């Protein structure tokens, strides 16, 4: 079976008295409910945790970060094929003055997310990590964050989920109401091919109900540890809105630090994004990027004006980072330079591929090999218009999580799942947001919705 409900059900005996805690969390008076922020429910954006202090961001050290808490739900009820798991989360006062998010990973099945008995979202994708904006649903003090694990309404397109510890790397975190909502970043050659250009777009958000100034900035260090550029900009954003701040500085010396497969230690530039308020830095978001640009030119996949020769290996991340690192090193030693997973991977998988100099063709969790040749309407899930929104949701979830990684050179619509209306719509959406890298679909079978 493509889900882990039975495994979760076995954990019921360990639930203890937590069930009583979950059932006893009452709704607060309406006057206590926080004002609605920029967004609510499921969101799509770059997967990155904000840090309180720069040294913690540099070290990726979450211990002691006040804006972060682990989410480790326990089973407390079962009914038919569904199992309820949850955690009573104690939200401190300082969090209620910000925007609160939940990151879910390794759930292993479809689920319905509720917070304090309010439905937040229903998710059919059993493998792709997901994020949710929770601010309208939470309050100071105890909050019941519950997942109802169930059979997916789109089970026929789910890949078998990875065998990892349930809910590993799931967490809640908060950001200031004036903060970084998302970003796009790339370090690419300039038009003369002599220098590099940092193309950075920071989406800033203001979750207050009125206009507020928001200051965002960045710095970038060379692979050798030299500070190359530092800048910040203030922008006034209307209440409950976002706006984009763009930076495009020249970065010199990049041709000596090209990110390419084959190198023993591919060079990576360190970028730190931050916000500033009243002279103090409020949050830090770290990122490592390689210099170069993957482009589709005249039907050829190129980098540094040379056609790429891809040696592919099908591989999904193992249960842990250490094992995955060993596997990836072994694949590289055998001459492979391109990794092709079956569905979106943990964020650390892309970090490893960045560090090792391995290309990745990222893939949405769409895997429906049965009846893939039946092109009647509804004959295959890929040609069932009722699933169009689900296909788009999965493609968006894949794209926004991994698009900023240097290792990702192309995006695949899914595994062998036939072709049809849903794949056409998915291709059109991806092409509307991705202007450089190709969109690939092996089962396009010569139709227009695949670039290679």
Task: Please identify what each model-predicted range represents.
Residues 1-8, 19-347, 351-355, 409-410, ...:
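Secreted/periplasmic carbohydrate-active enzymes, especially glycoside hydrolases
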Residues 14-16:
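N-terminal signal peptide c-region/cleavage motif recognized by signal peptidases
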Residues 338-452:
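Substrate-binding/catalytic cleft of secreted carbohydrate-active enzymes
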């Amino acid at each position: 079976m493509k889900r882990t409900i039975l495994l979760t059900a076995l954990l019921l005996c360990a639930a203890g008295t937590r069930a009583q805690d979950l059932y006893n969390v009452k709704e607060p008076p309406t006057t206590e409910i926080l004002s609605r922020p920029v967004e609510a429910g499921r969101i799509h954006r770059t997967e990155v945790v904000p840090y309180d202090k720069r040294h913690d961001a540099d070290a990726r050290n979450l211990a002691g970060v006040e804006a972060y808490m682990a989410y480790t739900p326990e089973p407390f009820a079962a009914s038919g094929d569904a199992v309820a798991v949850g955690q009573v989360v104690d939200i401190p006062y300082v969090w209620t003055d910000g925007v609160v998010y939940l990151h879910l990973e390794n759930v292993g099945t479809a689920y319905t997310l509720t917070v304090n008995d309010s439905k937040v979202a229903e998710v059919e994708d059993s493998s792709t990590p997901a994020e949710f904006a929770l601010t309208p649903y939470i309050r100071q003090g105890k909050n019941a964050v519950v997942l109802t694990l169930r059979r997916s309404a789109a089970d026929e397109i789910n890949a078998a989920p990875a065998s990892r510890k349930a809910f590993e790397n799931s967490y809640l975190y908060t950001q200031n109401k004036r903060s970084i909502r998302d970003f796009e970043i790339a370090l690419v050659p300039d038009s003369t091919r002599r220098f590099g250009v940092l193309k950075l777009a920071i989406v800033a958000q203001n979750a207050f109900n009125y206009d507020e100034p928001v200051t965002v900035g960045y710095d970038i260090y060379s692979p050798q540890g030299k500070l190359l550029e530092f800048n910040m900009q203030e922008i006034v954003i209307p209440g409950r809105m976002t706006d984009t701040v763009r930076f495009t500085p020249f970065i010199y010396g990049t041709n000596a630090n090209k990110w390419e497969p084959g190198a023993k230690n591919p060079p990576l530039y360190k970028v730190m994004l931050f916000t500033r308020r009243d002279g103090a830095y409020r949050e830090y978001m770290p990122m490592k990027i390689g210099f170069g640009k993957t482009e589709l030119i005249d039907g050829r996949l190129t980098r540094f004006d040379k056609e790429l020769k891809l040696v592919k290996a099908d591989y999904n991340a193992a249960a842990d980072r250490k094992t995955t690192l060993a596997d990836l090193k072994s694949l590289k030693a055998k001459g492979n330079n391109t990794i092709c997973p079956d569905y979106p991977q943990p964020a650390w998988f892309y970090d490893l591929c960045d560090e090792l100099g391995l290309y990745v063709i990222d893939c949405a969790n769409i895997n429906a090999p049965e009846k893939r040749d039946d092109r009647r309407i509804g004959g295959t899930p890929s040609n069932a218009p009722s699933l169009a929104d689900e296909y788009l949701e999965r493609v968006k979830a894949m794209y926004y999580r991994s698009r900023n990684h240097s290792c990702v050179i192309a995006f695949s619509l899914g595994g062998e799942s036939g072709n049809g209306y849903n794949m056409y719509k998915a291709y059109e959406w991806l092409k509307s947001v991705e202007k450089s890298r190709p969109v690939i679909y092996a089962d396009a079978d010569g139709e227009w919705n695949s670039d290679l």
